[in-house]
């Protein structure tokens, strides 16, 4: 596990973004952990998150010309990742995001930021049903850009209704790579090194055995 991945998990635990217990997901499944990226909600959190996303992007090796943040949660992620790439890696990465509703005055249109073109990496917090990806794909197609990859903070590595995960569906349907700061396996590796979290580790392992891909 890379240092930034460990730091991400520790920040998520500290901010209670990542919690252990028994949680009922939208799918109806009972999960032993819950992840709510909305609790990364201060300036320092955002600065750190940007660094983690930037590190994951560089680790992926994907050729990226622009970061796209789907409204609404993807907007601060794209922004802070672009800042981190400039500050820590001397990469001046263009970014843009969409509005939910087109603006009919001022600069107009549905996009804000750099022109949407080239190899685009979409950044978001998690993928559940993949709806935001599908909507964003339409926007990217309209501008004749290419979706090169999707970057999220956590890959739960669990099946959807069928035999594959929502992430695998996105990779299959759009021919792009989805990568993340951490995966469920990374979380399990982290928990394995924390003796006081053994009960949580056992519960997460059991959940992976039942629903994992």
Swiss-Prot record:
Its EC number is 2.4.2.10. Orotate binds at residues 34-35, 128, 156. InterPro entries: OPRT, Or_phspho_trans_dom, PRibTrfase_dom, PRTase-like. It catalyses: orotidine 5'-phosphate + diphosphate = orotate + 5-phospho-alpha-D-ribose 1-diphosphate. Pathway: Pyrimidine metabolism; UMP biosynthesis via de novo pathway; UMP from orotate: step 1/2. It comes from the Bacteria. Its cofactor is Mg(2+). PROSITE patterns: PUR_PYR_PR_TRANSFER (PS00103). 5-phospho-alpha-D-ribose 1-diphosphate binds at residues 26, 72-73, 99-100, 103, 105, 124-132. Pfam families: Pribosyltran. Keywords: Glycosyltransferase, Magnesium, Pyrimidine biosynthesis, Transferase. One of its GO terms (molecular function) is magnesium ion binding. GO terms for biological process: 'de novo' pyrimidine nucleobase biosynthetic process; 'de novo' UMP biosynthetic process; pyrimidine ribonucleoside biosynthetic process. Catalyzes the transfer of a ribosyl phosphate group from 5-phosphoribose 1-diphosphate to orotate, leading to the formation of orotidine monophosphate (OMP). Homodimer. NCBIfam families: pyrE. This is Orotate phosphoribosyltransferase. It comes from Photorhabdus laumondii subsp. laumondii (strain DSM 15139 / CIP 105565 / TT01) (Photorhabdus luminescens subsp. laumondii). The gene is pyrE.
């Amino acid at each position: 596990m890379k240092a930034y991945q460990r730091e991400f998990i520790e920040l998520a635990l500290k901010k209670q973004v990542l919690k252990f217990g028994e949680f009922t997901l939208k799918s109806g499944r009972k999960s032993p952990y819950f992840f709510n990226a909305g609790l990364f909600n201060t300036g320092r959190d955002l600065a750190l998150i940007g660094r983690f996303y930037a590190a994951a992007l560089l680790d992926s090796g994907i050729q990226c010309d622009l970061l796209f943040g789907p409204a609404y949660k993807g907007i601060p992620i794209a922004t802070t990742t672009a800042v981190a790439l400039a500050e820590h890696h001397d990469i001046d990465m263009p970014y843009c995001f969409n509005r939910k509703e087109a603006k009919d005055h001022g600069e107009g249109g549905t996009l804000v930021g750099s022109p949407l073109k080239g190899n685009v990496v979409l950044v978001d917090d998690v993928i559940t049903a993949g709806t935001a990806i599908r909507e964003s794909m339409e926007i990217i197609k309209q501008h004749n850009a290419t979706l090169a990859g999707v970057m999220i903070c956590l890959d739960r590595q669990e099946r959807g209704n069928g035999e594959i995960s929502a992430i695998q569906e996105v990779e299959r349907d759009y021919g792009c790579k989805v990568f993340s700061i951490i995966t469920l396996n990374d979380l399990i590796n982290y928990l394995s090194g924390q003796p006081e979290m053994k009960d949580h580790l056992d519960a997460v392992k059991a959940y992976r055995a039942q629903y994992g891909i």
